[in-house]
Amino acid sequence: MAAKKGVRIIITLECTECRTNTDKRSPGVSRYTTSKNRRNTTGRMEIKKFCPHCNTHTIHKEIK
């Protein structure tokens, strides 16, 4: 039998400024993983988190 699919899903958040910013501290893109409730948050998440590559707090958006 298949396991029942839960309400919470694991998502990946990616820095929006790492793609376009050329004056970064180090090369690369910052990514975080977290979970969200599928029923309460139907749209894409946007959270302000610390990016070690940009060395500042930036907006991280949900990616596929």
From Swiss-Prot:
Protein's name according to its UniProt entry: Large ribosomal subunit protein bL33
Source species: Rippkaea orientalis (strain PCC 8801 / RF-1) (Cyanothece sp. (strain PCC 8801))
Family: Belongs to the bacterial ribosomal protein bL33 family.
PROSITE patterns: RIBOSOMAL_L33
Domain of life: Bacteria
The keyword Hydrolase belongs to this UniProt entry's keyword annotation: no
UniProt KW Lipoprotein keyword: no
Gene Ontology terms describing biological process: translation
InterPro entries: Ribosomal_bL33, Ribosomal_bL33_CS, Ribosomal_bL33_sf, Ribosomal_zn-bd
PANTHER family per UniProt: 50S RIBOSOMAL PROTEIN L33, CHLOROPLASTIC, LARGE RIBOSOMAL SUBUNIT PROTEIN BL33C
